[in-house]
């Protein structure tokens, strides 16, 4: 084929064929290439944006009303009629006025905390890859990795440095070159993290990752709803993060199952579903990379706090019980479930941060692989014996490990740790769990996040609250699961309540440790046994007597107060009884930010959301308590027995026998 004088485009069939002519005078290169109007076509471009002229706007002959509409809106990048713009952090997200996609502004704290944790995780992970992240408004910091491999390999690195000096300083030169690699916010980093948000809804969280977290290679925002996926795409263009963020319209579990290969795994997986994350946990523990980060939210707190223990077991493999420590127990239930599912694939978890705030819980865990470490998992889980009378609890480990020289022997634990009835009040025990009985925070990691947030307070809108919550987390006793509540101890024996400083001082004076808990305002987390706590309360009751004649002999209060204390409590206030977070007046427990601030209504699969929770609440309020007292009102309801043909009251029946109120096909009584 002769191609002399013929352009490659013509030879490829994209231009005029031999013998054909094309007038290009006054025609742009795009038009000549077939991307604009064809010959003899005209297109008015006066007042038309370049996007429209390039074929991304209306075609020739089409019209589009742009009066009062911004160019971005006309191009599909701005809000459409009826839509609003939600601004949070550095993101500006388009939001349908009809609330078709789930959005809850109260969870700004959740998203801020996630960005802070991800930033610190990226700092330490990318430091191993020779990349230093840059956070606006933050001073340069020395990075110390939290990985076990680096801690164990310090001596090896020092040996390599010494060897490098003798070989011409090769190691130092390579490290100097690596120090020049930086990753800034909003820039794509080839050595960076791959992030997945499995249930993205409007895409706000993913867009904030792209705009606020440095060191990212790719962010995948997925949602099963086609409307949500379309909105995510529009929001991606609206925030100019198309170079970092990609949209998927897939089932979250299938998307993660397809990423189980070592080279396809995600460094960070964020799951924030409506309700329980249980259906996604199995796929998540497989799709996260070695040492990767899982960020999980649970909003089904009614189930996890003890209202439906059987439902909790079906979802998480653990029975929840009603107790005052239910919020920390919920954290330990989800950690138990994650570790159990990871163990199936010879993997295990390392909790970095676990918080219970507002109406949900949020956990951040690293997932690692190791068959030997997985064998320890049984000894990390425990059953909970909870007294229904006085609230005393005891933990029973599921497994036991003993050291035999260089080897470890694993065996079943022995128990139970309690008798048939409570030794303090004589009541029975409830059995809950199993739960995660190891520390739920990595204090070293939390301290780094706290330092970064407090040193750059303008970065997040909820920085003060993050600082307060994380400060309390660092003050908690990490090796003490669960807690008591001071007002519950007083309520059990029907006496007035000592101040928190007095009670904490009494525990410290008795020779035990004590701390608060971020999960409950009046929590007492201590390694003191329940017997010591009740002795302290008995001593307090002697100073503030209770009228014994009003107590039943079978009540927990009577039995507890009938025993003389063996520990003489001292309630003199100590300086170390007041934690630093309390002295500094940090925002530890935030008041309700707005009316009806809890979880929003569930999104419908076909688009839109269900009725507002406030409307449902008004509709069903007092449904069980307000009984109908006027029997004449019962005539408004059909008789169920008449419908079945079994009513024997006839005309004297207080319910209606009107055939119109019956279901179709339900005949009347036969004589």
What are these regions, as identified by a protein language model?
Residues 1-671:
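SAM-dependent transferase fold signal centered on methyltransferase-like domains
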């Amino acid at each position: 084929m002769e191609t002399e004088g013929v352009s490659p485009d013509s030879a490829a069939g994209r231009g005029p064929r031999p013998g054909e002519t094309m007038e290009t005078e006054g025609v742009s290169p795009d038009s000549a290439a077939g991307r604009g109007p064809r010959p003899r076509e005209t297109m008015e471009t006066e007042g038309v944006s370049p996007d429209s002229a390039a074929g991304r706007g209306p075609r020739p002959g089409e019209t589009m009303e742009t009066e009062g509409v911004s160019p971005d809106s006309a191009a599909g990048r701005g809000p459409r009629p009826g839509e609003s713009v939600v601004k949070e952090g550095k993101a500006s997200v388009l939001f349908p006025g009809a609330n078709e996609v789930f959005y809850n502004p109260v969870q700004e704290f959740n998203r801020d905390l996630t960005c802070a944790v991800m930033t610190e995780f990226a700092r330490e992970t990318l430091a191993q890859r020779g990349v230093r992240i840059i956070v606006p408004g933050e001073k340069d910091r020395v990075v110390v990795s939290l990985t076990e491999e680096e801690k164990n390999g310090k001596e090896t690195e020092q040996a390599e440095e010494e060897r490098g000096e003798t070989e011409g300083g090769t190691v130092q030169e390579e490290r100097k070159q690596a120090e020049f690699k930086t990753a800034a916010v909003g820039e794509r980093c080839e050595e960076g993290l791959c992030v997945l948000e499995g249930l993205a809804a409007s895409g706000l969280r993913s867009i904030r990752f792209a705009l606020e977290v440095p060191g990212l290679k790719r962010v995948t925002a997925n949602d099963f709803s086609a409307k949500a996926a379309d909105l995510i795409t529009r929001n991606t263009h609206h925030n100019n993060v198309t170079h970092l963020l990609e949209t998927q319209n897939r089932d979250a579990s299938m998307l993660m199952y397809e990423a189980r290969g070592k080279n396809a795994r995600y460094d960070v997986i964020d799951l924030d579903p409506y309700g329980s994350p249980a259906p996604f946990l199995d796929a998540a523990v497989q799709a996260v990379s070695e040492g990767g980060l899982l960020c999980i939210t649970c909003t089904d707190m009614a189930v996890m706090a003890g209202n439906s223990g059987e439902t909790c077991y079906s979802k998480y493999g653990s029975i929840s019980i009603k107790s005052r420590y239910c919020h920390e127990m919920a954290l330990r239930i989800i950690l138990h479930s994650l570790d159990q599912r990871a163990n199936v694939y010879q993997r295990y978890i390392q909790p970095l941060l676990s918080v219970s705030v507002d109406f949900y819980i949020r956990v951040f865990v690293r997932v690692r692989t190791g068959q030997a470490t997985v064998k320890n998992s049984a000894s990390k889980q425990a059953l909970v014996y909870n007294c229904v009378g006085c609230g005393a609890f005891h933990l029973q480990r599921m497994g036991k490990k003993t050291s035999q020289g260089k080897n470890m022997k694993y065996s079943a634990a022995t128990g139970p740790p309690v008798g048939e009835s409570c030794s303090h009040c004589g009541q029975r025990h409830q059995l809950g769990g199993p739960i995660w009985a190891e520390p739920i925070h990595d204090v070293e990691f939390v301290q780094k996040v706290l330092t970064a947030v407090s040193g750059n307070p303008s970065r997040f809108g909820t920085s003060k609250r993050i600082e307060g919550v994380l400060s309390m987390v660092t003050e908690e006793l990490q090796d003490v699961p669960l807690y008591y509540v001071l007002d519950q101890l007083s309520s059990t024996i029907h006496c007035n309540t000592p101040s928190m400083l007095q009670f904490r001082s009494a525990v410290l004076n008795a020779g035990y440790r004590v701390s608060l808990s971020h999960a409950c305002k009046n929590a007492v987390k201590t390694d003191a046994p329940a017997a010591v706590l009740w002795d302290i309360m008995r001593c307090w009751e002697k100073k503030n007597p209770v009228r014994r004649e009003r107590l039943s002999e079978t009540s927990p209060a009577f039995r507890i107060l009938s025993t003389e204390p063996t520990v003489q409590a001292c309630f003199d206030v100590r300086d170390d009884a007041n934690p630093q977070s309390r002295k500094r007046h940090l925002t530890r427990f935030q008041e309700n930010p707005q009316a009806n601030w809890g979880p929003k209504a569930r999104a419908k699969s076909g688009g839109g959301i269900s009725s507002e929770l406030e409307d449902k609440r008004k509709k069903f309020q007092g449904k069980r308590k307000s009984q109908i007292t006027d029997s004449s009102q019962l005539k408004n309801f059909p008789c169920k027995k008449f419908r079945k043909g079994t009513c024997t009251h006839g005309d004297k029946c207080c319910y209606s026998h009107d055939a119109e109120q019956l279901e179709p096909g339900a005949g009347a009584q036969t004589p």
